[in-house]
Amino acid sequence: KIRADKKERSRYKEVYIMKLEEKNLIVKRAYKSVYKCDDCIVKVFNEGHPKSDVFNEALNTARVEETGLDIPKVKEVTQIDGKWAIAIEYKTGKTLEDMMESDMKNLEKYMEDFVDLQLQVQSKKSPLLKGMKDKLARQINGLKDLDATTRYELLTRLESMPKHNKVCHGDFNPSNVVVGKNGKMTVVDWAHATQGNASADAAMTYLLFALKDQKVADLYLKLFCKKSDTAMQYVQQWLQIVAAAQLSKENELEKDFLMRWIDVVDY
């Protein structure tokens, strides 16, 4: 049985290597390339990418699987040509982002479905996921673009915010929602998942929308607050905190936008 399992893993790796060609490349980021390989996708991380980050993404995904949410399951963590890689189930369909952009007249309907899906995710608990407030504090503490006084004020505000334990995606935006032919929506890419405050997760989603289109961001926030019975001001209290956390990802295209949010902090 053990030999058979090893043989099967070896066969999978050979298939992955054969399929890792430009024609199968789905997404290329600064630190990883994502390929379509038969019934799965394979994320291949650059050499030098922290091993702990790779295993953390796989572990996050596995823990969210255990909540009962229907998400793409982890199939394998392996090395390919000296680079760490994760194989995850492939979900057929279009991204909700593509559907929104090609059918703007139905934007509000798509956004309602999007918010319903986010609330479904946030209804779950996963006690072993990392705590959101701890992660946000680490990200803010590590920022070199902010002076010590600003970091202190942000951390003080973070500490004063309520601590919850809902499953939060951390990068919940329409590009991470796949819609199948039957209309079923699936959330992908759980690398940033934590347990924490749903309104903080909503604040991050709002910022991600606002980076592209302020009107769409405002529509999202209105629907989220209505459907979750949350005061808009409460979500807005998280905006400076999550803007600082997003700044830690060092995306130069977002830097000026995020700094403007951080600069308007009213202490």
Task: Enumerate the predicted regions with their spans.
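Conserved short submotifs of the Hanks-type protein kinase catalytic core
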Residues: G82-T95
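Helix-rich C-terminal or lid/interface subdomains of diverse kinases
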Residues: A203-Y267
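Internal "kinase-insert"/substrate-recognition segments embedded within catalytic cores
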Residues: K105-M132
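An alpha-helical support segment within catalytic cores of ATP-dependent transferases
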Residues: S123-G170, K181, T186
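Short beta-strand micro-motifs within the conserved protein kinase catalytic domain, predominantly
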Residues: K73-W84
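Hydrophobic residue at the +6 position relative to the catalytic HRD Asp in the kinase catalytic loop
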Residues: V177-V179
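The N-lobe alphaC helix and its flanking beta3-alphaC-beta4 segment of protein kinase-like domains
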Residues: K51-T67
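ATP-binding glycine-rich loop module of kinase domains
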Residues: N24-F55
